[in-house]
């Protein structure tokens, strides 16, 4: 299911539940992905600088961990992560899943991410429906 209702435990369906669970897509990101992310951010900081004036929360992993081992993370439209949207869509289609839920956060959006997301939507809008969270609930 693309989403379901629950009351206390998101793993227990409750058709009358007050809360809605919407599973976010996830996939593996290799160390090479993070090397590219860090290098491109250093080579062209204006393009990869977050647009907002906020700061994202510190993650649990160190840069060393990101650069040396794969990580299973959510599919995101933020910054350089947006370069993986086509791969996420292929993975979703191969799994015969009708939904690809992508997240983004205003504190992490960049000019690069906006352009990549815009290209992704332009490339796929004829064959896929793009919706917002508010239109699903």
Question: Model-found features: residue ranges?
Answer:
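Generic alpha-helix signal with a bias toward terminal, lower-confidence helices
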Residues: 34-36, 114, 136
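Extended, basic/helix-rich recognition subdomains
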Residues: 63-64, 76-124
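Active-site beta-loop-alpha junctions enriched in small/polar residues
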Residues: 25-29, 105-109, 135-136
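Non-catalytic interaction surface on structured domains
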Residues: 126-128
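Active-site-adjacent pocket scaffolds in enzyme catalytic domains
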Residues: 1-93
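His/Asp/Glu-enriched short active-site or ligand-binding loop at hydrolase and phosphoryl-transfer sites
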Residues: 1-3, 130-135
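Conserved, mostly hydrophobic/aromatic
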Residues: 22, 102, 132
